[in-house]
């Protein structure tokens, strides 16, 4: 979000030099810079001991492609806590391991995605109302039904890291 008016006092902001950051909207009344803001989210590729990954169908996102677990970070929450919470809320699963897989910028949504790989032993998910279906698939089948690889898609950078971690050739 780009600020044009001060969220505290409503005064129109002016561009002001902010060190190395260049011209940043500034409130002369509050004496505060207003840097652009964006949403912080988590996205988790869940896998099990049988080298399967959990794919979900969320029809409000796509009727054609499957996704992996994701959600917004709540203010005051760490990315790791958000990842564990989202997996529990959406799938009823408790992760035994959670490994950071980097970050990914999703420009269409102005979101910074905090990427994770999460391990749990195989058990059937208990779906929240926002998940239409979820199932385990062999790891090499993920590209068949997931959103296609693209610069905006955070799934595939995580997928390639998981393939490498588990000793699979990384050719996707």
Predicted regions and their residues:
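Acidic, metal-coordinating catalytic segment for phosphate/diphosphate chemistry
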Residues: 1-43
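A short linear hydrophobic-aromatic micro-motif
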Residues: 15, 55, 98-102
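Short acidic/glycine-enriched loop/turn segments that link adjacent beta-strands
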Residues: 21, 62-63, 107-111
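Conserved beta-strand segments that form the floor/walls of ligand-binding pockets within enzyme
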Residues: 26, 67, 115
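Conserved Nudix-box catalytic region and its N-terminal flanking loop in Nudix hydrolases
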Residues: 47-89
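Unchanged
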Residues: 73-157, 170
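Eukaryotic intrinsically disordered, low-complexity segments enriched for acidic and Ser/Thr/Pro residues
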Residues: 160-163
